């Protein structure tokens, strides 16, 4: 059980690198790919150097998945008028929170699943417009 906990911490570190990488590359069109590549390498290296090769694999896989997912959010936020600096600040903060939460057993693995699933869901709904107060203007 201890080894699974350590692998979960490495997975959480990969998720944190994915979120931070997405924030760093938010202004670029290829933000998801750049964030995934950086998080893959960083998550794998940290997991392997701090723990062992199994943790390195988990950190790399979760880093790539979260980089793709968070990069989709970051690119969409900047495209809709958010500032790249503000987006980066929010995503780096989210990465720190994700890393701290990964010390809870199994949460690091759940982060690796939740971030890409939420990004896929947001991407499917990307064309919809929220009516908001426009419904009252009729």
Positions of predicted regions on the chain:
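Short, highly charged, low-complexity non-transmembrane loops/tails of multi-pass membrane proteins
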Residues: 122-138
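Hydrophobic alpha-helical transmembrane segments
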Residues: 21-27, 44-52, 96-103
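Loop-to-transmembrane alpha-helix initiation sites
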Residues: 55-61, 103-115
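Alpha-helical transmembrane segments and their membrane-interface exit regions
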Residues: 18, 63-72, 114-126
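Transmembrane alpha-helix boundary signature
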Residues: 47-57, 76-82
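Cytoplasmic-side transmembrane-helix entry/capping segments in multi-pass membrane proteins
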Residues: 27-42, 57-65, 81-92
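Membrane-helix boundary connector in multi-pass membrane proteins
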Residues: 79-111
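N-terminal signal-anchor/start-transfer transmembrane helix
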Residues: 3-27
């Amino acid at each position: 059980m201890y080894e699974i906990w350590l692998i979960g911490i490495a997975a959480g570190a990969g998720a944190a690198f994915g979120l931070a990488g997405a924030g760093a590359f938010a202004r670029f069109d290829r933000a998801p790919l750049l964030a995934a590549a950086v998080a893959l390498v960083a998550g794998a290296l940290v997991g392997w150097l701090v723990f062992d090769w199994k943790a390195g694999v988990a950190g790399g896989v979760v880093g790539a998945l979260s980089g793709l997912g968070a990069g989709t959010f970051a690119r969409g936020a900047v495209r809709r008028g958010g500032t790249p600096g503000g987006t980066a600040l929010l995503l780096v903060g989210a990465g720190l929170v994700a890393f701290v939460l990964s010390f809870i057993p199994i949460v690091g693995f759940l982060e690796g699943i939740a971030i890409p699933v939420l990004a896929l869901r947001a991407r499917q709904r990307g064309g919809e417009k929220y009516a908001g107060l426009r419904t009252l203007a009729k």
